[in-house]
Every structure is written in C-alpha cells, then in structure tokens.
Amino acid sequence: MIYNKMKKLSYSLLLVLAVSITSCTSNRRGSGDAAVVSGDYLGQAAPGDSARLFASGIISTGMTERDFAITPDGNEIFFCREAGNFRYVTIFYSRRSDGVWSIPEVFEFCTDPAYKYVEPHISPDGTRLYFISTMPADSASEANEDIWVCTKTDGRWSEPRNLGAPVNTASKEFFPSVTVDGTIYYTHLDPVSGEEFIYRSKLVNGVFQEPEKLGPNVNTGSARYNAFVADDESYIIVPAYGMPDSFGATDYYISFRDSLDNWSQPVNMGPEVNSASPGEWSASVSTDGKYLFFMSDRMGRGSPGRLSTKTLQEFHNSPQNGNPDIYWISTTVIEKLRENATF
C-alpha cells in the first residue's frame, strides 16, 4: 500500500467535516435539509473521455478521499476518507433505497478509532466486500494490515472475518482485487527487502492457493502498489513510482493479459488519467465496466482570492484543494490503450 512508503506526504487535518450535499435533483426534503440525491452513480452526469471530479460535496470534499467501490446492482457505494495525516482512515458507505441515496456515513464495522480501515473492493458477483484493516486477527495476534472480508446474506453484510493464510501473513497485505473466478490480486510487503510487490492467489474448490509473485511487467518501476485487476483478468492497473515517462511521482500504468497468461509491457495511462500531482495510487473500474474511478490530488481550484479566515476555510473545506479526491472517466481510455498493447 502506498501509505506505507508515501505516508510522509503531508495532508491537512480538517477541523470541520462538512458534507454539504450538492443537489442532483430539484426535489428537497425541506428547508435546511440536505438535498435529495437520486439516480445512478449518485445522479452524476456520466463522464466521457475527459476525467471529472466525482460527486463534489457528496463524496469528494475538502478531506482526503480515495478507494471507490460500487455493487453490481449500483445501489451501494463504498469509499475511504482520512484525516490527521493518516492517523484516522475509514470506509464510508452510501445506499440507495426507494431511489434515494443516503448521506455517506462510516460503514458499521469500521468505527473503532484504534484501527485503520481502507481499500474496499466488491467481488464481481456482489456477494463479498473485501478491505484492509489493522484489526488483529484474534486475541493472540498483533494489529497488522490484513485483508478482511464481509459476506452479504439476505441483503445484509456479515461481520468481517480475516481472510487468513496463505494470503495474509505476518507481514502486511494491501489492496485486494478479485476476478470472476475468485482469484485475488493484492500487494504484499516483503519483510526482507522492505519493498511491496503484486501477488495473486487462485481460488480452487473454495480454498486460496499458494500466492504467486507476478512478473516485472506488473511489478514495474522502483516501487509499485495497489493494483486493480479487471474482473475477467484481461488487464491490471498498477500505480507505479520511478518510471521514466511519469507525469509526477506516482502514475497509473496498465498491462494487458493474453490467453497464455502473459502480461504486456506497462503503459502510462496518459494525461487523461495521470497528472504531475504525486497522490495518484488508487484506481478501480465499476462493475458494469463503464467507468474508471481513480484518486488524484491535482489542484482544480483557483486562488481563494483575498486571504481571510472565511476564504481559507472555504478553500480548505472544498474539493480540489490539494487533498486527494475521486475522479471518474469512461473506460474507453482503457480500450484505446489495449489496441497498442505490446507483449
């Protein structure tokens, strides 16, 4: 996980959490209440070939936001917020009921401030929620970054359970991403070298097999982390650092997989996705395959004008202020890159 190497990046601790819901419809509950938000993807206008800030004032705020996941039916959204220079980080949740989205709140199993909860991922069939937490696996274990999973039964998420060996180890595991056949891709911290590498473990008869470290076309750059794999395993998006054609510190790269399990040379995903900003290390694709969501701390706001308490607070509490936000773009950007994949 990038925070293991990049947590020295300074993010401001917000003094005020302002979730001022931006209206996506003209209906309101009443004077002083939050606007009713309805429609797919929180009623946001779909992006084309240019990236857009996602859900300004609802999900993307002045805080640090990252790690977007949505269920296949489009009715549940998970994402992360952090504060206090990563002292506190947890998973937020919004659900659409009777056509109306709830205001994002902390997910019910991610409320203990003693632990971190991050990097949610929904399985392609929508029955499992994977995420990372520093919760101890049991009373005899020490707190450590492990992969946890909740199972959905009768419309309710179960309490999380530790995924266990062989995927989880005494070291640290990050950023789970699962294919249709249950294969899990994730980042593992090598306790000897101190480097992070992308691994995968196949699911056979309901049991995860011995993890496999992927080759150099996936484990690229001087550092890499937080890889997202397509549900059909046809491509993988890898945030990589130290690449010669990088726009900034860490950029999103993509590698495509052929029928013989070969991975193509990694390709920078271009200015449509990457920027000179350093905070770009969490990407995912919606379960309908239409949209790429990604984290970026690019600045999008102009000067706050004449500096005052009011203007600085407004700037501080607004998205695109230098803290990471969530953006989205059509996956046509991926298909264009696929055409020129080199193995």
Protein language model regions, located:
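N-terminal secretory signal peptides that target proteins for export/translocation
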Residues: 1-7
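Sec-dependent signal peptide recognition
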Residues: 7-14
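C-terminal or otherwise distal, non-catalytic regulatory regions appended to signaling enzyme catalytic cores
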Residues: 8, 27-28
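Short, linear, compositionally biased motifs with a strong N-terminal bias
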Residues: 15-19
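C-terminal motif of bacterial Sec signal peptides marking the signal peptidase cleavage site
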Residues: 21-23
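Short, conserved micro-motifs composed of acidic
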Residues: 28-343
